[in-house]
Regions:
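Residue-level detector of structured alpha->beta connecting loops
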Residues: 31, 110, 137-139
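Small/aliphatic-rich secondary-structure junction motif
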Residues: 2-57, 84
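A short acidic, glycine-rich active-site loop
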Residues: 55-70
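Glycine-rich, Arg-bearing micro-motifs that act as flexible, cationic patches
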Residues: 113-138, 149
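Structural beta-alpha unit
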Residues: 1-2, 80-114
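Conserved beta-strand segments of the P-loop GTPase G domain that flank and frequently precede/overlap
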Residues: 9-12, 36-39, 89-91, 114-117, ...
Length: 149
Protein backbone atom coordinates (compact mmCIF):
# COMPACT_ATOMS: atom_id res chain seq x y z
CA UNK A 1 0.00 0.00 0.00
CA UNK A 2 1.27 3.45 -0.96
CA UNK A 3 0.68 6.62 1.03
CA UNK A 4 -0.08 8.80 -2.00
CA UNK A 5 -2.17 8.01 -5.07
CA UNK A 6 -0.74 10.84 -7.19
CA UNK A 7 2.36 12.94 -6.64
CA UNK A 8 3.73 15.93 -8.51
CA UNK A 9 7.53 16.16 -8.37
CA UNK A 10 9.03 19.50 -9.42
CA UNK A 11 12.60 19.60 -10.74
CA UNK A 12 14.73 22.01 -12.74
CA UNK A 13 18.01 22.15 -14.62
CA UNK A 14 20.00 21.99 -11.36
CA UNK A 15 18.93 18.40 -10.66
CA UNK A 16 21.74 15.88 -10.33
CA UNK A 17 22.28 12.20 -9.50
CA UNK A 18 21.37 12.75 -5.84
CA UNK A 19 18.14 14.46 -6.92
CA UNK A 20 17.22 11.50 -9.10
CA UNK A 21 18.12 8.99 -6.37
CA UNK A 22 15.99 10.79 -3.77
CA UNK A 23 13.02 11.03 -6.09
CA UNK A 24 13.29 7.39 -7.14
CA UNK A 25 13.61 6.12 -3.58
CA UNK A 26 10.86 8.25 -2.04
CA UNK A 27 8.38 7.75 -4.85
CA UNK A 28 8.94 4.01 -5.15
CA UNK A 29 8.11 3.64 -1.46
CA UNK A 30 5.22 6.09 -1.23
CA UNK A 31 3.57 6.90 -4.58
CA UNK A 32 1.34 4.99 -6.99
CA UNK A 33 1.50 7.51 -9.82
CA UNK A 34 4.03 10.29 -10.34
CA UNK A 35 3.96 13.37 -12.53
CA UNK A 36 7.41 14.88 -13.02
CA UNK A 37 7.20 18.61 -13.68
CA UNK A 38 10.38 20.03 -15.18
CA UNK A 39 10.50 23.80 -14.70
CA UNK A 40 12.28 25.57 -17.54
CA UNK A 41 13.33 29.01 -16.36
CA UNK A 42 11.82 31.96 -18.10
CA UNK A 43 13.28 35.44 -18.22
CA UNK A 44 11.19 38.53 -18.84
CA UNK A 45 12.16 40.60 -21.86
CA UNK A 46 11.66 44.37 -21.70
CA UNK A 47 8.95 45.63 -24.01
CA UNK A 48 7.15 42.31 -24.30
CA UNK A 49 5.63 41.97 -20.85
CA UNK A 50 2.56 44.18 -21.31
CA UNK A 51 1.65 42.91 -24.75
CA UNK A 52 2.13 39.22 -24.15
CA UNK A 53 0.69 39.08 -20.64
CA UNK A 54 -2.39 40.89 -21.91
CA UNK A 55 -3.10 38.05 -24.32
CA UNK A 56 -2.39 35.36 -21.75
CA UNK A 57 1.07 34.32 -22.83
CA UNK A 58 4.03 33.93 -20.52
CA UNK A 59 5.85 37.05 -21.71
CA UNK A 60 9.39 35.75 -21.61
CA UNK A 61 12.10 34.18 -23.66
CA UNK A 62 11.75 30.60 -22.44
CA UNK A 63 11.90 27.90 -25.03
CA UNK A 64 11.53 24.18 -24.46
CA UNK A 65 14.75 22.63 -25.70
CA UNK A 66 15.80 19.05 -26.44
CA UNK A 67 17.78 19.19 -23.18
CA UNK A 68 14.57 19.89 -21.22
CA UNK A 69 12.82 16.99 -22.95
CA UNK A 70 15.76 14.64 -22.32
CA UNK A 71 15.88 15.64 -18.66
CA UNK A 72 12.20 15.01 -17.96
CA UNK A 73 12.35 11.76 -19.95
CA UNK A 74 15.22 10.57 -17.77
CA UNK A 75 13.14 11.09 -14.62
CA UNK A 76 10.09 9.40 -16.16
CA UNK A 77 12.14 6.40 -17.32
CA UNK A 78 13.77 6.10 -13.90
CA UNK A 79 10.40 5.98 -12.12
CA UNK A 80 8.79 3.70 -14.70
CA UNK A 81 11.66 1.23 -14.22
CA UNK A 82 10.61 1.05 -10.56
CA UNK A 83 7.11 -0.02 -11.61
CA UNK A 84 5.32 3.29 -11.11
CA UNK A 85 2.99 4.98 -13.53
CA UNK A 86 5.13 7.98 -14.46
CA UNK A 87 4.37 10.99 -16.64
CA UNK A 88 6.37 14.06 -17.58
CA UNK A 89 5.42 17.70 -18.01
CA UNK A 90 7.50 20.72 -18.87
CA UNK A 91 6.38 24.17 -17.81
CA UNK A 92 8.04 27.51 -18.37
CA UNK A 93 7.82 29.94 -15.51
CA UNK A 94 9.73 32.95 -14.29
CA UNK A 95 10.79 32.70 -10.67
CA UNK A 96 8.12 35.19 -9.55
CA UNK A 97 5.19 33.12 -10.90
CA UNK A 98 6.59 29.61 -10.45
CA UNK A 99 4.31 28.96 -7.48
CA UNK A 100 1.14 29.74 -9.40
CA UNK A 101 2.22 27.49 -12.27
CA UNK A 102 2.97 24.60 -9.89
CA UNK A 103 -0.26 25.00 -7.91
CA UNK A 104 -2.33 25.22 -11.10
CA UNK A 105 -0.75 22.05 -12.47
CA UNK A 106 -1.13 20.19 -9.16
CA UNK A 107 -4.83 21.07 -9.02
CA UNK A 108 -5.36 20.18 -12.68
CA UNK A 109 -3.77 16.76 -12.13
CA UNK A 110 -5.56 16.16 -8.82
CA UNK A 111 -2.42 15.20 -6.92
CA UNK A 112 -2.40 14.63 -3.17
CA UNK A 113 1.34 15.37 -2.74
CA UNK A 114 3.61 17.98 -4.27
CA UNK A 115 7.36 17.51 -3.88
CA UNK A 116 9.37 20.69 -4.30
CA UNK A 117 12.74 19.51 -5.56
CA UNK A 118 13.79 22.46 -7.72
CA UNK A 119 17.02 24.28 -6.89
CA UNK A 120 16.76 27.67 -8.63
CA UNK A 121 15.75 30.27 -6.06
CA UNK A 122 16.82 28.14 -3.11
CA UNK A 123 14.96 27.65 0.17
CA UNK A 124 13.23 31.03 -0.04
CA UNK A 125 11.59 30.10 -3.35
CA UNK A 126 10.49 26.72 -1.98
CA UNK A 127 9.02 28.39 1.12
CA UNK A 128 7.06 30.83 -1.05
CA UNK A 129 5.67 28.03 -3.23
CA UNK A 130 4.76 26.03 -0.11
CA UNK A 131 2.77 29.01 1.20
CA UNK A 132 0.96 29.33 -2.11
CA UNK A 133 0.05 25.64 -2.15
CA UNK A 134 -1.24 25.70 1.43
CA UNK A 135 -3.24 28.88 0.80
CA UNK A 136 -4.93 27.52 -2.32
CA UNK A 137 -5.21 23.84 -1.42
CA UNK A 138 -4.79 23.17 2.31
CA UNK A 139 -5.54 19.45 1.92
CA UNK A 140 -2.55 18.82 -0.36
CA UNK A 141 0.61 17.53 1.29
CA UNK A 142 3.88 19.32 0.48
CA UNK A 143 7.37 17.87 0.79
CA UNK A 144 10.22 20.36 0.58
CA UNK A 145 13.43 18.62 -0.46
CA UNK A 146 16.84 19.67 0.83
CA UNK A 147 19.22 21.18 -1.72
CA UNK A 148 21.38 18.71 -3.62
CA UNK A 149 23.85 21.19 -5.09
Amino acid sequence: MKLYDKALVTVDQMGNELTRDRIREFCSLNCKEVFVCYIASEHIIAGEVGRSLAVGEHGGDAEVTPEHIDAVQEYVDLLAAEGMAAHGRIITAAEYNRGDAIVDLAQQLGVDLTILNFEVGGARAKAKVTQQIVARNPEMAVLVARPTT
